[in-house]
Amino acid sequence: MFIHLDIDCFFVSAERTLDKNLLDIPVAIGGRSSNDIFSSKKIQRTIATNRAAFSSKILSNDTHKSFKEYFIDENGRIRGIITTCSYEARKFGVKTAMSVNEALRLCPKLKMIPPNYSLYDELSNKLKDLLEKEVPLIEQYSIDEFFCDVSGYIKEDEILEFAHFLKKKILDELDLPISIGIASTKYLSKLMTEYAKPNGIKYVSSQDMPEFTKDIPIENFSGIGKALCEKLKGYNINTLGDIRKNQKLFYSWQKSGIDLYNRVCGIRDNKLTIQRERKSLGIGRSFDVVFDRNEVRRRVMILSRYLSFIIKKEKVNPLSYSILIRYEYGIKAR
């Protein structure tokens, strides 16, 4: 049996552990490309131990910025995108990756908060430590998601009781709301979490899974992106039930097709990735047009220095290095 845990609106929930006035109101965390590292101001920074989308590698202790200081640029324009938002904000149509400007237009009373990556990193590590004390095998899938393999450790008829125990322990010790999905295999447990949100638990047995998933749209399954979704719809495959009916087609696509079919059907999807192998490391920043070549060189040197810190912390020895520059009109140089 597998348990998948996903912290609800993690960045918002993390901020609410510090400020209870944020409860039950529309809240969003907004991010923008942080160019503080180019500043001559002395700020203590650390390297993040978590690696995930919308999570900065460079953590600054200078996080107490106002809305004006963080989101409004020198020309008075509101900058940044929504990295996560509360369910109260989602009712107004606010979504992840939406511009802060658009989010405020949809929800004028939206409470915008600059990110505090040090806090998120700390809470994620605390959750991992908690789970490692309660579960034999865990995989950290992202900064706010974990898989737990409890096969042979928790009986199936006791799995719901154990999930409630974990949920209460996480709330009591970390003050974080969490959604939990339970299934016989890894990726089906992740799918179940979508039906546990917000702040719930969803368990479907292997016997009932085909019926439960037959009408679920293919785009709801982890690993089916936009391009693959369009490809599958070209074969008139629109639901997970359609995937189950087309074994020969998926097996003809070799490994990628076989893996997807098996994940959807709950076949041989029972291995956790305890430690992920890093294939690349990088750091980058976006900023307004700079006409001074010396300033551009200075910024490249600063980024290179931070990259060297990350490489040292990860204890790796890269075989190659590259610099990628994207210009104002989409022209690239490497």
Where are these regions (language model features)?
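DNA-contacting surface of Y-family translesion DNA polymerases
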Residues: 228-334
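Short, structural beta-strand-to-alpha-helix junction motif
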Residues: 99, 217, 239-240
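Catalytic palm subdomain of template-directed nucleic-acid polymerases
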Residues: 148-167, 236
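Short Gly/Ser/Thr- and Asp/Glu-enriched loop/turn motifs at secondary-structure junctions
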Residues: 141-145, 183-186, 316-320
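Long, highly charged, low-complexity intrinsically disordered interaction regions
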Residues: 158-217
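Generic non-transmembrane alpha-helical segments
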Residues: 126, 130-134, 165-174, 231, ...
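Residues that scaffold, gate, or flank divalent-cation-dependent active/transport sites
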Residues: 1-143, 147, 257
